[in-house]
Design a protein with these regions (language model features):
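Short, contiguous clusters of charged residues that form electrostatic/catalytic patches at enzyme active sites
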Residues: 25-29, 80-83
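Helix-rich effector regions associated with P-loop NTPase G domains
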Residues: 1-12, 16-18, 23-25, 32-43, ...
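Short amphipathic alpha-helical segments
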Residues: 25-28, 56-59, 110, 158-161
């Protein structure tokens, strides 16, 4: 079933992690599908930088593969890169977190908002368990509206009848 992710956003943050499941092709698909038809800037947040030695390398790979992409290595657990990520929005902005299950979106919400969004353990294979099942908005401590979204299983492009001509 097709479901629009969110509307009226000012910034889209695609959250990923730098582990063995990291895929530039997935990042490209997310950027293309989620940012298509959207004037909001996109930032790739390579979360869990505290778990590997090459998180910044992954961010650089993404910047190289996707011209114009803003990418930053962060750790919601240790706070690495969080101050830099916060510079991407202003008070009153609507900021959307999107990405696969288990990449730390809800943990990032907790850091940015000082709230207690439910988080979960990873399965034995390192994948998330889809703890977030609905979109939910929070207010960051600097006054932005932060929307936490469920883990994406797949993304794609679609258009309303008659709108294909504007996309191509």
């Amino acid at each position: 079933e097709r479901q629009p992710l969110v509307a009226n956003l000012d910034l889209l943050i695609i959250v990923t992690d730098p582990t063995g499941d990291f895929s530039i092709r997935r990042v490209e698909r997310y950027v293309e599908a989620l940012a298509s038809g959207c004037d909001a800037p996109v930032v790739l947040a390579v979360n869990k930088a505290d778990t590997v030695d090459d998180a910044e390398t992954r961010a650089a790979e993404a910047r190289s593969a996707i011209p114009g992409l803003d990418a930053v290595a962060i750790s919601a657990r240790t706070g690495t890169g969080i101050a830099e990520l916060r510079t991407r929005w202003s008070p009153g902005d609507t900021v959307v977190l999107a990405g696969s299950s288990g990449v730390g979106k809800s943990t990032l919400v907790n850091v940015l908002c000082g709230t207690a969004a439910e988080t979960g353990d990873l399965r034995g294979d390192g994948r998330g368990m889809h703890k977030t099942t609905t979109r939910r908005a929070y207010v960051t401590d600097d006054g932005a509206l932060l929307v936490d979204t469920p883990g994406l299983r797949e993304v794609g492009l679609y258009s309303e009848e008659g709108s294909a001509g504007t996309a191509f």
